[in-house]
Each structure stands twice: as structure tokens, then as C-alpha cells.
């Protein structure tokens, strides 16, 4: 996805892995609890929970943490979370979508608005930038899963819409409503995926220079550091030369 995979690489290079990992475990656990509470606590009978557990496993979340997150949903234990989407613009006019799960809407809205303002952006109304994205299913495989032709054939058979392959691996795209079915079919052909999730895929991007990217990263990192925030997506584009300097 434009912006998102590059952003993950930047975060890795910046040495934020340990801090991000702890936050990632917390965010994935929250998604499991919410998914289980909204539907059946059995992943086989609850597509959203199945995807949440699958994503947690792919990110090396321990089995006991996953089981605890599911148990938390039973018997009314744990907080009730609202799912909210915020939309706005970052430095350079980059469109930003923030997905949050919160037990206090006022707190989260205030924090997100403040984070945008302090980092050269501004929070907009719902719908102000989402028209520049499509909701899609995304399944990622490492390069060793197969060559581009093999993965393309498996993706077509599975009902996917698009495949992007390079030396780092394969990203398979499908309709958001088909993700569970497509990922299951891909597993039968290619084995376990690295990641399976619903994402916002930009349909248009904004090119940034080094200074613009540095400013944008401050905003994206600050948003990601908010415990209520689950996912942040931005439609930036930058040259390899700029990316190498971050």
C-alpha cells in the first residue's frame, strides 16, 4: 500500500521496535477482545475474530495472551469499546485516517485533535479524506512463498483482485468482504501468511520531500503512540533517496 509499507520500514529503521511491539500486542489483544465480544468467542464461527487471532499469531503474540484476550470478552469482563474513525490532513496535505477503539470518546477525540494540531496537521470531518482510499483486504507473503507467477496463480484461484510482488515479498489484495475466504484459499496453496488484515488502500498519493516526510513522521508516530489508536494510514509517497535519509 502506498505509504503504509514504507512507513513500517521507517519505523523499523528508527529503532522503535521494542516500544512498538509492546503497543502492537496491546492493540491486537484489544481487537481480539472486541471481536469476540461482538460475535462468537469461537474463531471458527466468527470471521472477524479468526482474522484478529491470525494477525496476532503472525505478529508472534503468545498463545496465552490471545486466550486471555478472548476470555476477557466472556461474562461481561473488560471495558466496552467504541470503534471510531478520524480523518484529517497532515503536513504537506497528506490525507490521514486514524482508527481508534476507546472507552471514552471525548478523551480520544481531544487527544487526536491535539496531536494533529501540534504536528502541523488538522483534524477534519468524517468523510473528509476517506474518499481518497478504498477499504481492502490485504494478505502478505514472504518472497520464499513462491515466485511472482506462482503467487499470482494462487491469488487468481483464491478470488483476489490484485498482486504486488517484489524482492521483499508479495502483497495480495481483495475485496474487504472476501478477505476471510481469500486468505483461507491462499493458505491451502501457499501456507501461512505473514499478515492478513483489512486496510485503507490509497487511490491517490501525495509526494513529499525529505523535510515533508520528517514532519509527517512526527505526526504519524505521535498518533501511533496513543493507546486508543489501533491503526493509522496515510497516502504519502516519497522517493527511495528520501526514504533512505529518514
Curated annotation (Swiss-Prot):
Keyword Transcription set for record: yes
GO cellular component, one term: cytosol
Chief place where the protein resides: cytoplasm
Keywords: Cytoplasm, DNA-binding, Transcription, Transcription regulation
Disulfide-bond pairs as recorded: none
One Pfam family per UniProt: TACO1_YebC_N
UniProt xrefs under SUPFAM superfamilies: YebC-like (SSF75625)
One GO BP annotation of this record: regulation of DNA-templated transcription
Subcellular location(s) of the protein: Cytoplasm
GO molecular function term, any single one: DNA binding
Domain of life: Bacteria
PANTHER family tied to this protein: TRANSCRIPTIONAL REGULATORY PROTEIN YEBC-RELATED, TRANSLATIONAL ACTIVATOR OF CYTOCHROME C OXIDASE 1
Entry's family note: Belongs to the TACO1 family.
UniProt name for this protein: Probable transcriptional regulatory protein Dshi_2762
Organism: Dinoroseobacter shibae (strain DSM 16493 / NCIMB 14021 / DFL 12)
